[in-house]
């Protein structure tokens, strides 16, 4: 979340206070739990905010943020109250508070989530106070900063104790005398990796289960001599492995400032492997569990702890060795592996669906908790109006919940209107008639960037817009109704283009270049490192390398010629356009989140499935007020089977708002925003006049069908509704 620090009157700075949750609040009533809410006051400034009330709990979760203007001498008081009692008398319902003095504010800024002990409002109060509150103070300065570890002891008023300090970009946790990372379940402090919170006094409650690795070494490295950050050779690009002063290993993505306990070299779903199947621990390692049951690992050699099982690295190393045919796995003379090279026999296959779940989770952490991205357009001018509205928004605004409205229509957007907007917009935006894109060849209808798009002086801004729309669709779980060439997706991933990528785009050119590589071209071809292409009826020349028109292609340099030709074929005149599109896409989808995917996988993530499997459709359809053997249901599927592919896609778009199917199939159709899970395609038999047309509820993926008397009438009414109607209304 990006926050711009502004000054008011030259003496105040803007900080964002996030009140995440509270834990272990005092229970004052024997028979019922409190309804806690938090109150935030900047003392003496008149600024006052209150969170939502959470019903019947001692562990409320708010995750709400507030922008505060804080002067150099201001303090912030955060108090928690029981909403059930605040109206009874003065001071009733008080559950605890914490006051941050000015020096505490300056030291706590940009240090991540901190857990603070709640205190009494006055030392003489009789009511007992207990529990903690988790908060963070953020400014723009945290991104990319390193800084030292913050020691916040003694900074809190009323002797309020800060649980643990942390440097910028560092996950929060706490070590006692025996290191024990601890988390109170997923999302306890922000819902994602790297937001871990430790409980005070954990040392006394920790019960570690110890399974020693063989030969624990006597010599250890002291924390004072340990490096606090380094770039491992096998870490993904942009990641650094770091160690806190307490000995915890974590990983920092230097470009975004996001930190995590999870080792990026280990696929997240690989952590579910049974520890018993992994063999013994390496020498000097020990496995322990926290009181919550989470397993962590202690490296006595370096005096560090981590959540990642060190044995999982053997699985990854083994897989990379299997992919490298020339790489020999060390084997002893008796055929067994050398010591320390154990790996499980089971193979690990990384599933696209699992990778997509990880991507969705990472993107959900980037979505602001408040506000909407509102788009209101007319169907007649959908392209230009969408362009103007999307381009004037900031990237962080585009990440808010998407709400689309068609001017003059009353439909409420719970997902279906947005899907229809994207469907109609893509039909205009990707149309070669506008000149931004063109078909790859005359008989292959995949899209590629038009090198002659510069005829429109604002074409780069439009490509930026296209990139934003693609990112918007992926970020909010929708699909783009259009297919690009495979090399386009490869470029979007930042991967180099190869000759084999040309086959699906231009088979004839691919065949010619392969022939050049496989045959002796001496005295056969008279080519130079200069190629010709047509632009607006003019024949232009392009040199593949300096002075290329005077450099003959020979048997010795033909590989270089083919490589340069392939690069030119895909990037001729489109470098600026592609960079503008990629910029817009990465404003919503950070590039590092795409690292695990291949080009075919990215194509499915952006475009979904364009082939409709009727058997899968039937198997994942819900029936309401009708049965599978009802005439209406049987006639409906009979009509679907009689449709061609285009009409089936149009029917799917009529009911769901999109012609595309999720890569998991119809079982993963998404419905209204915020639904607990997928919403299946639904056939609903309604009591209505049979002269009426079927109605669709795109937010619920539901089609309402009157009880038609015959198949012919159902077919006619269904076809009319699909092909002749448009617009949304509210019932």
From Swiss-Prot:
Keywords: Cell membrane, Cytoplasm, Differentiation, Membrane, Repeat, Transferase, Ubl conjugation pathway. Residues 221-234 have a biased composition (Polar residues). The keyword Transferase applies. Residues 1-120 form the C2 domain. The keyword Repeat applies. One of its GO terms (molecular function) is ubiquitin-protein transferase activity. E3 ubiquitin-protein ligase that acts as a negative regulator of BMP signaling pathway. Mediates ubiquitination and degradation of smad1 and smad5, 2 receptor-regulated SMADs specific for the BMP pathway. Promotes ubiquitination and subsequent proteasomal degradation of TRAF family members and rhoa. May play a role in dendrite formation by melanocytes. This is E3 ubiquitin-protein ligase SMURF1. It comes from Xenopus laevis (African clawed frog). The gene is smurf1.
